[in-house]
From Swiss-Prot:
One of its GO terms (cellular component) is cytoplasm. GO terms for biological process: L-arginine biosynthetic process. Its main location: cytoplasm. The gene is argC. SMART domains: Semialdhyde_dh. It holds the Pfam family Semialdhyde_dh. This is N-acetyl-gamma-glutamyl-phosphate reductase. The active site is at C147. Its EC number is 1.2.1.38. It is found in: Cytoplasm. It comes from the Bacteria.
Length: 343
């Protein structure tokens, strides 16, 4: 299969290149950038010297359609809604890593992203690509989930799908490494601001909230809202999500663990920790795994769920490739069979 990557110079695009180089059934046909053309990526990223020689090209839809079977779009939100349309219309596989096609309600997108939404008919066509819970495995136009949304939804799914929790009780405390803010530097991602520091940001206003709610209410329509906070922590990669919920009825630690084990029994990239152990960000670094730990406090009737992912892999490029593997009927782990980098 021939693939093109639009937005190849961003962190998501770079991860796509790294992972696709290990894929047995995929060749990278073309690489595209808005900011640089006619140069190789190694000119900007020396770690790719001798590994990726394809020149960066301007975006020419006719040429991309001619040379490619699949197009990955790894641009910031607000760009893909226009860039993706020719490839969708041409019948290519399209996987969008931005948030432009995740929300079915265009007014919600414009409220939370502050940008004009994609056309409604394209929003209707997009399949939300939470890989472990795809509705249509044959869909060829995928809205890849956000990193916070992925960690949160995988953490909550076993309980919410069976409607076992008090729908008003969901509290999510999510923390991200600095790469989650993207490649373009800002005051909040400056070394002197992030080193030895932790910063709460977008309190009650993060754009992944409606995406999470959209999926949760598909599983349990009675959920009215979630309390969701996000923080930047001084690491390069990783999402560390701590989720608190109250079960409708008391549950034992063993029952809780068995529920998660059975839900994810056939999920290649979700690993449930042994009872009374909890995951760390480092154990999933540079991998497509989501690791989950669980606890139940009988005194407070509160379940604590700890869900960790690498924001650039399971939270972006890795899940995008997992979605490609599902739609193309490749082995789900092709291009993703990495042991996490440790220490």
């Amino acid at each position: 299969m021939k693939v093109s990557i639009i937005g190849a110079t961003g962190y998501g695009g770079l991860e796509l290149i790294r992972l696709l180089h290990q894929h047995s059934s995929v060749d990278i046909a073309t690489l595209h950038s808005f900011s640089a053309q006619s140069e190789t990526l190694a000119n900007f990223y020396p770690h790719l010297k001798g590994l990726e020689a394809s020149p960066l090209e301007k975006i020419n839809p006719a040429e991309i359609i001619e040379k490619s079977d699949t197009v990955f779009i790894a641009t910031p939100s607000g760009i893909a809604k226009d860039v993706a349309l020719p490839y969708i219309d041409a019948g290519l596989n399209v996987i969008d890593l931005s948030g432009d096609f995740r929300l079915k309600d265009n007014q919600l997108y414009e409220k939370w992203y502050g940008k004009k939404a994609a056309p409604e008919d394209y929003l209707a066509k997009a399949e939300y690509g939470l890989a472990e819970f795809r509705d249509n495995e044959l869909a060829t136009f995928i809205a890849n989930p956000g990193c916070y949304a992925t960690a949160t939804l995988l953490g909550l799914a076993p309980l919410v799908k069976k409607q076992l929790i008090d729908p008003t009780s969901i509290i999510v405390d999510a923390k991200s490494g600095i790469s989650g803010a993207g490649k373009v530097p800002s005051k909040s991602t400056h070394f002197t601001e992030t080193n030895e520091n932790m910063t709460l940001y977008k309190m009650n206003s993060h754009q992944h909230i409606p995406e999470i709610m959209q999926q949760l209410t598909k599983w349990d329509k009675s959920i009215p809202a979630i309390q969701f906070s996000t923080s930047l922590i001084p690491i390069t990669r990783g999402i560390f999500t701590t989720i608190y919920v109250k079960p409708k009825n008391p549950i034992t630690q063993q029952e809780l663990h068995q529920l998660y084990e059975s839900t994810y029994e056939h999920a290649s990239f979700v690993r449930i920790q042994a009872e009374n152990t909890y995951p760390t960000v480092k154990q999933v670094t540079a991998s497509n795994y989501c690791d989950i730990g669980l606890a139940y406090n009988e005194k407070t009737n509160v379940i604590t769920i700890v869900s960790v992912i690498d924001n650039l892999v399971k939270g972006a490029a890795g899940q995008a490739i997992q979605n490609l593997n599902i739609m193309a009927n490749f082995a789900e782990s092709d291009g993703l069979g990495f042991i996490p980098v440790y220490p």
